[in-house]
């Protein structure tokens, strides 16, 4: 694959000049009252601009992350996207990182077609968002909920166990099973 930007370009013929959602499978976000994508769509419907889901990192999340540089707005939970940089480890503590959740407007396609591939030959969505933000409003939206990076083996296992425990039809039986195992 030639990067996330290339994957999004492959979907262009299906979009029909409408805003669309991008959900990356390695980020799972649990929020009991309002799913992450619903939070982003609500903000898109309110402001009518590209939305980038983000969350503040803590010390446990030490893998390389795309850290957002943004400017606060008068809108609660919404900031104006400026830039993104890759940060590793504790340098990322307390900073806002991109999640794998986006609501994009169709003008991203023209920008993606012009983005120069990086040193690995990948077309990066982050690069396209920087260009888009220089032309029009692009917002970051703080997503509420518990995030699991299921590309990380331990987070994958935690998500599996916690989701099973939350399910009404499995929770009690699964809890008993875990007690037997431990």
Predicted regions and their residues:
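Conserved beta-loop-beta/alpha segment of the NTase-like Rossmann-fold superfamily
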Residues: 1-65, 104-106, 113
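Generic low-polarity alpha-helical segments
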Residues: 11, 68-70, 84-87
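Catalytic-core segments of class I nucleotidyltransferases/pyrophosphorylases
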Residues: 21, 34, 41-45, 74-148, ...
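ATP/pyrophosphate-binding catalytic subdomain of soluble kinases
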Residues: 54-57, 69-70, 81-82
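Cationic, amphipathic, low-complexity alpha-helical segments enriched
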Residues: 62-67, 71-78
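Domain-scale signature associated with acetyltransferase and cell-envelope carbohydrate enzymes
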Residues: 180-182
């Amino acid at each position: 694959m030639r990067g996330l930007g290339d994957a999004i370009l492959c979907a262009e013929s299906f979009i029909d000049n409408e805003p669309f959602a991008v959900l990356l499978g390695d980020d799972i976000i649990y929020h009991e009252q309002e799913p992450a994508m619903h939070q982003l769509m609500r903000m898109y419907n309110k402001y009518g601009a590209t939305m980038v889901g983000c969350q503040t990192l803590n010390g446990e999340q030490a893998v390389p992350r795309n850290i957002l540089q943004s400017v606060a707005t008068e809108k609660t939970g919404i900031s104006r996207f400026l830039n993104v940089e890759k940060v590793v480890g504790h340098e990322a503590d307390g900073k806002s990182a991109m999640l794998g959740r986006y609501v994009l407007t169709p003008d991203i396609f023209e920008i993606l077609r012009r983005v120069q591939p990086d040193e690995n030959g990948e077309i990066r969505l982050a690069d396209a968002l920087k260009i888009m933000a220089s032309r029009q409003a692009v917002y970051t939206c703080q997503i509420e909920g518990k995030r699991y990076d299921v590309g990380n083996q331990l987070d994958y296992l935690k998500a599996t166990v916690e989701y099973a425990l939350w399910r009404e039809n499995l929770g009690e039986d699964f809890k008993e099973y875990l007690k037997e195992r431990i």
